[in-house]
Design a protein with these regions (language model features):
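Gly/Ser/Thr-rich beta-alpha loop segments that engage phosphate groups in nucleotides
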Residues: 117-124, 164, 176, 186-189
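Interfacial loop-to-transmembrane junctions
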Residues: 172-194
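Membrane-embedded alpha-helical bundles of polytopic integral membrane proteins
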Residues: 1-157
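Hydrophobic transmembrane alpha-helical segments of multi-pass transport and channel proteins
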Residues: 157-161, 191-192
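Transmembrane alpha-helical segments of integral membrane proteins
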Residues: 40, 162-177
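Juxtamembrane/transmembrane-helix interface segments of polytopic membrane transporters
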Residues: 133-137, 171, 202, 206
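Hydrophobic side-chain positions within alpha-helical transmembrane segments
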Residues: 97, 101-105, 161, 165, ...
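Final/C-terminal transmembrane alpha-helix of multipass membrane proteins
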Residues: 191-206
Length: 206
């Protein structure tokens, strides 16, 4: 029930963000602050030495600030808002594709960092991302090209790397979730780990 309630709440927030940019300011503020606190908590539990902990926290703070700032600035333009929306769909598709294909086909593990990740899941992630991005881009532009496949592959691979990175940190910190901010889902970073890297890499590519 908690997971369903959280999903509905996030859907409502997404719709508000699309229609009203004012809502985006508050969402990004909460997202930034909570994500930073979750990251710092992870680093603290891993018990790096003070220098590495400081560098890690500073780097992530700068990264989050740039991510949220650019996200907000681009959202002021309808064309970029559509692009961001499509990229977010791609990141979500990557996550869902990995989960579904991994559950159905199972097979060899992808890495020790995250035992639940399989090669089948990684391939499924790319396949579903290609399908979803192709449909979304065709819907908005009535046009398709091979570039869509390239963008989809970059999106999926980037999301999977982001996911694995935070899985590595959680494994080192010996925790299941980065937090409990989202009931039934864990912390914000548990839901947006892939998006943080996926959207950033895509925007650089575009």
């Amino acid at each position: 029930k908690k997971r369903i309630f959280t999903s509905i709440t996030l859907l409502i927030l997404t719709l508000l963000i699309i229609k009203y940019n004012v809502a985006l300011v508050y969402v990004l503020l909460v997202f930034g602050v909570v994500s930073l606190l979750e990251f710092m908590s992870l680093i603290n539990k891993i018990k790096f030495n003070k220098f590495y902990s400081l560098i890690s926290n500073i780097f992530f703070t700068i990264y989050l600030f740039l991510f949220c700032s650019i996200f907000f600035l681009l959202s002021n333009f309808l064309q970029f808002k559509i692009i961001i929306f499509i990229l977010l769909l791609g990141c979500i598709a990557s996550d869902i594709g990995g989960f579904i294909f991994g559950k159905i086909f199972k097979g060899p593990k992808l890495t020790r960092i995250s035992p639940n990740k399989t090669y089948a899941g990684a391939i499924g992630s790319i396949i579903l991302t290609i399908i979803v991005l192709s449909c979304a881009i065709y819907f908005f532009t009535n046009n398709l090209s091979y570039v869509v496949i390239i963008i989809a592959i970059i999106t999926s691979v980037s999301c999977q790397i982001g996911d694995l990175f935070f899985s590595f940190l959680k494994r080192k910190a010996k925790v299941k979730d980065t937090g409990d901010f989202l009931p039934g889902h864990g912390g914000i970073l548990d839901r947006l780990d892939g998006i943080l890297l996926g959207v950033s890499i895509d925007m650089l590519f575009l």
